Amino acid sequence: MARITGNRVDAPAGAVPAYNDYGPGFYCTPYAELAREWACPQRGKDGIANRYELDLGGLGVLDLEAEGCSVLTWLAVLVSNRPVQVSSPIARDGMEYLRRVFGIDLEPYDVVRGYRADDSYFSFVRAFLNNTLSVAQVGRAMRLGGLGSQVMVRSELAFGRLCFRGYETVPACEYYPLRMCRDASARRAFQDERAAADLDGLYIRDILREEVGPDDPRIR
């Protein structure tokens, strides 16, 4: 796995601030190329990508990308950990419903894997809560936008398994443009989905009205 940072970090010392996608933890990605992009958020400023190895044997792993795991579960985890400003009753009620019905207690898990949702991608979440994207549209926008996967190490047991395997300097001249290209791709996917009418789609208003649950086949 690779960790993106401005400095070499031989031994992660603990959690990042609580308001991250899956709560406090050590965030990495299993994809080296993606880590290199994340390491270069500024034009002209090289980054550093640290490499780690993690033995998952015996660890409790929650995979939010696994087959059978609804996008609503991913959304519920996000809105349970990241502050979301909502301005309408339906968005407020929808957020609370997601937390209550589709939320997952992360305490039993040592590691969480799933899509990332930085600020540009969080538009998907807000649009869904505001009833302008359907469940299917959110799923398509996430896949087509190339969000990328992240792995969050959250327990002491998992931290003890992390082994530092080196680091590399990442040239911004190469990876900053790639990062911006991925960001633009996600924004296009979002705009394309928002412009399309999903007349038969399942929206947050429908979920609230029908009290849709995790076993409903329409959310698979």
List where the protein language model places each region:
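Glycine-rich loop/turn
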Residues: 1-26, 34-36, 40-42
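Conserved NAD+-utilizing ADP-ribose enzyme module
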Residues: 8, 20-21, 37, 41-47, ...
